[in-house]
Amino acid sequence: MSDTDTKPSGQDGGDQKDGEYIKLKVIGQDNSEIHFKVKMTTHLKKLKESYSQRQGVHMSTLRFLFEGQRISDNHTPKELGMEDEDVIEVYQEQTGGLRNN
């Protein structure tokens, strides 16, 4: 289905950077953890979609953060400097906050 559920093919030569897989831990506001195995060059939209589907929540209502910075759909783990066992935090979008009297 997606790179989050596949295993390395083993065809990597000496330089494995682009085909390298890392494990990422996605932690929700309720401290639930879901682990993903992704390629360094996979767009993180796939991970976000998979997480949202597993949680039964629409992706647009969630915010994904890595080291305090919001993750966009076209980011890759390689671009963000992610390493094996890094953590992505997920927060429910909050709107409003202004109260009219």
From Swiss-Prot:
Localisation per UniProt entry: Nucleus membrane; Nucleus speckle; Cytoplasm; Nucleus, PML body
Domain of life according to the entry: Eukaryota
GO MF annotation terms: transcription factor binding
Keyword Amino-acid biosynthesis: no
GO cellular component, one term: PML body
PTM comment: Cleavage of precursor form by a sentrin-specific protease is necessary for function.
Cross-link (Glycyl lysine isopeptide (Gly-Lys) (interchain with K-? in acceptor proteins)): G97
Domain (Ubiquitin-like): residue spans on this chain: 20-97
Propeptide residue range(s): 98-101
Keywords: Cell membrane, Cytoplasm, Isopeptide bond, Membrane, Nucleus, Ubl conjugation pathway
GO biological process terms on file: protein sumoylation
Function noted in UniProt: Ubiquitin-like protein that can be covalently attached to proteins as a monomer or a lysine-linked polymer. Covalent attachment via an isopeptide bond to its substrates requires prior activation by the E1 complex sae1-sae2 and linkage to the E2 enzyme ube2i. This post-translational modification on lysine residues of proteins plays a crucial role in a number of cellular processes such as nuclear transport, DNA replication and repair, mitosis and signal transduction.
Subunit note: Interacts with sae2, ube2i, ranbp2, pias1 and pias2. Covalently attached to a number of proteins.
Annotated family: Belongs to the ubiquitin family. SUMO subfamily.
Protein name: Small ubiquitin-related modifier 1
Lineage: Eukaryota, Metazoa, Chordata, Craniata, Vertebrata
Gene that encodes it: sumo1
